[in-house]
Structure formats: structure tokens, C-alpha cells
Amino acid sequence: MKVILKSDIANVGRQGEIKEVSAGFARNYLIPQSLVMEANDLNLKIWKRERGILEKHREEIINSAREIAFKMEASKFTAKVKIGENGKIFGSITTATLVKIFEDNGFKVNKRDIILSDNIKEIGDHEISVRFHPEVVAKIKLSVINEKE
């Protein structure tokens, strides 16, 4: 079944694209969730009219995501933590902790957008990736220091 994507869908395509999907997937999931519309003559005419607006809107979103990513990459983030005798920190720095650090510096980030392979458990400089858009990922530097310093 041919469908027009109303939003970006992982492993299917991006908003505004016309894709071929299985009829069951379309009828049982995509259409009830309002993620797609069937690609019939009427919907194709509507889609062609709105396509330019969608592209312009997508570019605005990507540009604003790039702006925020650039500002965050230029900023310095520091986490002050308690340290044990062996040089390791008590507990760990999680995505929730990072969200708080970013908010304290004026940036609103969803914890699901923070790409962290494992919680941070050591002092030093760490690089963290934050996904603002599927096409925009920022590499942010975080310094973990002793809270007594």
C-alpha cells in the first residue's frame, strides 16, 4: 500500500515522502496513529500543494537545532561530585543528572536525546552526544571535578 508520511518514522522514511508499506502495517498501526495517509489521487494533490511548506518548516527546525547544538558545543559544562579515596566518584552521572546540569546552564534537553554509552563514573573530561534532530548531533564536553575544588 502506498502512503504519504505525515511525520518522520524510524525505518520507514521522513515526513512528506511517499512510501510503499505492507497493507497490514498501514491499516493496523500507521493510519490509526495518524502517522500516514493513503496515497490516493485526492491526498496526492493535497500533498503536492503542502510539500513546499513542509520542506520550509523542516529546514527551520533543522536550522534551530543546529543553532542550539552550536551554542551547547561552545559552552563549558562542569559536574561537581564527591570522590572516594580511590579517585572514583560516589554514584555516577546519569542522563537525568546531565539534564539538570544543562538546565542549570540555560539549555532544555530531553534525557532521551542524550547519547551516553554508560554512566560516567570517573573524574576528568568526557564527551557526550546530544541528538537535537535526527540530522543534528552535538558533541558536548563535560568536566567532572571534585566538589571540594
From Swiss-Prot:
Keyword annotations of the record: Ribonucleoprotein, Ribosomal protein, RNA-binding, rRNA-binding
Gene Ontology cellular component terms for the protein in this record: ribonucleoprotein complex; ribosome
Record-level Gene Ontology MF annotations: rRNA binding; structural constituent of ribosome
Keyword Glycosyltransferase assigned: no
Record keyword RNA-binding present: yes
A GO biological process held by the record: translation
Pfam families: Ribosomal_L9_C, Ribosomal_L9_N
PANTHER family assigned to the protein according to its UniProt record, in alphabetical order: 50S RIBOSOMAL PROTEIN L9
Entry's family note: Belongs to the bacterial ribosomal protein bL9 family.
Known role: Binds to the 23S rRNA.
HAMAP family hit by this protein: Ribosomal_bL9
Protein's name according to its UniProt entry: Large ribosomal subunit protein bL9
Origin organism lineage: Bacteria, Pseudomonadati, Elusimicrobiota, Endomicrobiia, Endomicrobiales
